[in-house]
């Protein structure tokens, strides 16, 4: 009998301690009806391979695939998609941790919302091995997601669950994307009209660490993000210049020097984009502006002149009650 959920995880060089916590958080889920497809993308590391083989020997739900060579995350995930036999597919990363009822709550969400194709969840962070409730709020409703996915990916990738029928219909990760393969896939799905949603509560602990992203890798991520955003805008008949694209991905540039001047240029660009998006009946301008404000506030927190940058944010738009609440929440989150 086929499992209800196929969990897919790719393993490369994650520390065994992190890997153990991640695997255990799946195996001890309150929802038991799943298969766990683990793709080892580091076949030359006998320690990792043997570690995973031990787990496979003690839990029949684990299906272990050892790639013949290092194939990269995108291809490894597509291997997992081909093997998935469950009604739903859940993503998981090898260094993150699921909360006990993650699978149960996402299955219930998709069962109760048959119009939704892809479901994510909110997240807590693990920073230097400590849980931190950092500022991160994802939109829950499809209309809000459609209105804001140009600015950022709508999901935390390892929190996502989606319907396996999508794979049978031909959906998979684009292997031309070394990074941001999830954002590229969600963008194509959204543009095709598929509906998305997020469970409001955090159901995973998402691990980050100082120095986690090298400048070299970040440069690759930025180029992938530029291609994705350019394709989104092209589908909306908007031609964007290379300099504008570089500005649009400024919030994700880890080594960027953020000045008030650059923040203002970013604000002008997204304001102009908002005017263009007003012509798109699927875009809710209030949701778009709220996400712009969140992004501006995050840029302000990195600014070389925080006071002048923050004052600019206050005058960026006529602030609604919701926007004022957003600013207040942001300030509190940085203090607590």
What are these regions, as identified by a protein language model?
Residues 1-223, 227, 335:
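Nucleotide-sugar donor-binding/catalytic module of glycosyltransferases
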Residues 208-336:
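C-terminal subregions of glycosyltransferases and related glycan-biosynthesis enzymes
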């Amino acid at each position: 009998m086929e499992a209800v959920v196929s969990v897919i995880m790719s393993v490369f060089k994650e520390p065994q301690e992190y890997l153990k916590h991640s695997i255990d958080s799946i195996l001890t889920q309150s929802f038991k009806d799943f298969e766990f497809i683990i793709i080892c993308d580091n076949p030359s590391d006998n320690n990792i391979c043997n570690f995973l083989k031990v787990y496979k020997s003690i839990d029949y739900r684990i299906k272990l695939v050892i790639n013949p060579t290092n194939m990269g995350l995108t291809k490894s995930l597509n291997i997992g998609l081909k093997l998935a036999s469950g009604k739903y597919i859940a993503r998981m990363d090898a260094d993150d941790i699921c909360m006990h009822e993650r699978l149960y709550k996402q299955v219930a969400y998709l069962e109760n919302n048959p119009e939704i194709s892809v479901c994510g969840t909110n997240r807590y962070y693990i920073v230097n091995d400590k849980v931190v409730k950092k500022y991160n709020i994802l939109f829950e409703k499809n209309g809000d997601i459609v209105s804001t996915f140009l600015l950022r990916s709508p999901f935390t990738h390892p929190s996502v669950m989606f319907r396996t029928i999508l794979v049978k219909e031909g959906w998979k990760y684009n292997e031309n994307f070394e990074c941001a393969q999830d954002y590229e896939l969600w963008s194509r799905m959204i543009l095709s009209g598929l509906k998305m949603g997020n469970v409001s509560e955090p159901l995973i602990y998402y691990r980050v660490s100082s120095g986690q992203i090298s400048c070299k890798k970040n440069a690759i991520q930025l180029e992938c993000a530029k291609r994705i955003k350019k394709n989104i805008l092209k589908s909306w008949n908007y031609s964007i210049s290379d300099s504008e694209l570089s500005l649009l991905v400024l919030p994700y540039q880890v080594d960027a020097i953020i000045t008030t001047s650059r923040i203002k240029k970013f604000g002008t660009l997204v304001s102009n984009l908002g005017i263009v998006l007003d012509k798109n009946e699927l875009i809710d301008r209030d949701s778009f502006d709220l996400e712009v404000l969140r992004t501006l506030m995050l840029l302000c927190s990195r600014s070389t002149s925080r006071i002048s940058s923050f004052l600019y944010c206050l005058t960026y738009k006529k602030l609604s009650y919701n926007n004022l609440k957003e600013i207040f929440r942001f300030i509190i989150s940085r203090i607590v």
